């Protein structure tokens, strides 16, 4: 099985897929505490919801071989997050691998969306794809010549939000 986790600022989505990329059941959605708690509390909550999902779906944990995580914000090629869950060593990827005891892939939510659409979705047979994510911030996942484009430092397409002079807005 494959564990998929989408950690948003307002939601936490957890799903388990078979090797044909079919969800065992629908994607389970929980409220998110990403901005309400410190990193340790957030990770405990994520672990609790992963465990709850595994139990609800009656899946043998030993059969889950890999996990994929999507996070908002700036994430580099090595899976280090600079916006949320900003652990320095071993980084959020390493912490999740220690927590779950399986390999973890982690990327920006817009990149994950672009890769999913290019691999399984409406852009399956398209070489160049732009996927725009508009939530609290704006993100862009780019597939160019059938490859995810990351840019020079691995964070291409993540706009976040742009401050406009005279308007008050909190930065995330």
Positions of the model-derived regions?
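Gly/Thr-rich phosphate-binding beta-strand-loop-beta motif of the actin/hexokinase/Hsp70
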Residues: 1-25, 131-148
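A short local loop/turn or secondary-structure capping micro-motif enriched for an aromatic residue
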Residues: 23, 33-35, 158-160
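Generic beta-structure capping elements
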Residues: 17-20, 72-74, 165-167
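Glycine-rich phosphate-binding loop and adjoining helix at the ATP-binding site
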Residues: 26, 30-121, 125-128
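Short beta->alpha linker loops
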Residues: 9, 108-110, 154
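Glycine-rich phosphate-binding loop of actin/hexokinase-like ATP-binding domains
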Residues: 125-172
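Hydrophobic residues embedded in beta-strands of well-ordered beta-sheets
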Residues: 12, 80-81, 169
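Hydrophobic aliphatic residue packing
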Residues: 2, 75, 102-106, 143, ...
């Amino acid at each position: 099985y494959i564990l998929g986790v989408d950690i948003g600022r307002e939601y936490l989505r957890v799903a388990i897929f078979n090797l044909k990329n079919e969800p065992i059941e629908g994607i389970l959605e929980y409220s998110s505490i990403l901005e309400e708690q410190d990193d340790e509390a957030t990770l405990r909550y994520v672990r609790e919801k992963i465990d709850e999902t595994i139990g609800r779906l009656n899946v043998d944990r030993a059969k889950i071989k890999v996990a994929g995580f999507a996070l908002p914000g700036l994430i580099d090629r090595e899976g280090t997050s600079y916006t949320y869950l900003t652990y320095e060593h071993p980084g959020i990827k390493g912490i999740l691998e220690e927590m779950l005891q399986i390999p973890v892939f982690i990327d920006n939510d817009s990149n994950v969306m672009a890769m999913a659409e290019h691999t399984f979705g409406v852009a399956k047979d398209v070489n160049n794809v732009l996927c725009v994510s508009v939530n609290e911030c704006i993100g862009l996942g780019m597939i160019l010549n059938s490859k995810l484009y990351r840019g020079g430092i691995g964070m291409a397409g993540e706009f976040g939000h742009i401050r406009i002079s005279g308007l008050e807005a909190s930065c995330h």
